[in-house]
């Protein structure tokens, strides 16, 4: 794996292992215990497998289909929990923002600022994120061609920040499905920035009549293995001790006790591919 600017991210370990990196954690901060327990378990696994690990969890979910859907436990409370994760476990943390004001606020708590897929073309949001000086992870919109992501990245660069990641999270395939075009990974890597594959949101089943997004978590391994096969730099995966009881995106997340076996297989696949290359 090319180090890019990743070596500049505080507490991002195992970069010399040759492995992909992962961004992993529960969809949203539900409480301190679930957040801490999940971070601790993922750290244990990634240290064993020598995988660079960035903890991910949203401090608030702004994009909900129904007005009564769970959005969070309170911004300040959630951000303080994320900061505690970074300090206690000595790992970098990423969370997403939804407007310019949140860029400045979240940058005081996390190492990486994430731009949601639906907001990937919002110029003022990208500029605000860039000006924090934090790494900016831009998720490719389900409606955006991979070649067009160079322009989103350039907005960050032209704002004085060259620390950009791009994330593939699927493309609309009709009204109620997404599909991963693995050519997107290759196309976005042409920008020179690290490219991540979101293996959980790529399996969403949107626009359900219930108003709650569905998913196909049984295919997470398939999507992830294909991503490793084409040479993706990082894997984004949401995981939870009990997805059935999760307050957001439970239908998409991988059960935490399945994570080690999945990552073990991905590392083995990565090593095999590197031998041939």
Feature names for model-found ranges:
Residues 67-76, 112-119, 175-179, 203-228, ...:
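Active-site-adjacent loop and "lid" segments of alpha/beta metabolic enzymes
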Residues 133, 137-239:
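Catalytic alpha/beta core domains of metabolic enzymes, predominantly
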Residues 22-35, 53-75, 240-249:
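Glycine-rich, proline-tolerant flexible connector loops at the mouths of alpha/beta enzymes
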Residues 26, 55-59, 95-97, 117, ...:
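A cross-domain feature marking catalytic cores of carbohydrate-active enzymes
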Residues 1-22, 271-277:
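N-terminal amphipathic alpha-helix/helix-capping segment at the start of soluble metabolic enzymes
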Residues 73-74, 88-102, 111-124, 135-146, ...:
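Catalytic beta/alpha-barrel core
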Residues 19-23, 52-56, 92-94, 111-112, ...:
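Structural preference for beta-strand elements that scaffold enzyme active sites
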Residues 42-44, 48-49, 68-94, 129-135, ...:
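Alpha-helix-loop-beta-strand connector modules within alpha/beta enzyme cores
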């Amino acid at each position: 794996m090319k180090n890019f600017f990743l070596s500049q991210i505080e507490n991002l370990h195992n970069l010399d292992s040759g492995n992909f990196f992962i961004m992993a954690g529960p969809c949203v901060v539900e409480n301190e215990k679930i957040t801490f327990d999940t971070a601790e378990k993922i750290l244990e696994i990634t240290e064993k497998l020598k995988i660079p690990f960035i903890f991910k969890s949203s401090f608030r979910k702004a994009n909900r289909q129904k007005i009564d859907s769970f959005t969070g436990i309170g911004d300040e409370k959630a951000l303080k929990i994320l900061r505690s994760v970074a300090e206690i476990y000595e790992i970098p943390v990423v969370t997403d923002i939804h407007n310019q004001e949140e860029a400045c606020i979240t940058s005081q708590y996390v190492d990486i600022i994430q731009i949601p897929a639906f907001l990937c073309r919002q110029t003022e949001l990208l500029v605000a994120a860039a000006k924090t000086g934090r790494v900016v992870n831009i998720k490719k919109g389900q409606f955006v061609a991979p070649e067009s992501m160079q322009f989103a990245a350039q907005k960050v660069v032209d704002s004085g920040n060259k620390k950009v990641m791009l994330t593939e999270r699927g493309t609309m395939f009709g009204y109620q499905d997404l599909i991963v075009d693995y050519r997107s990974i290759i196309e976005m890597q042409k920008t020179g920035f690290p490219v991540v594959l979101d293996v959980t949101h790529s399996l969403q089943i949107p626009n359900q009549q219930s108003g709650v997004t569905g998913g196909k978590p049984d295919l997470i391994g398939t999507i992830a293995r294909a991503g490793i096969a084409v040479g993706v730099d990082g894997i984004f995966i949401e995981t939870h001790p009990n997805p059935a009881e999760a307050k957001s995106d439970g239908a998409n997340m991988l059960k935490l006790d399945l994570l080690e076996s999945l990552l073990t297989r991905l590392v083995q696949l990565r090593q095999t591919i590197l031998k041939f290359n």
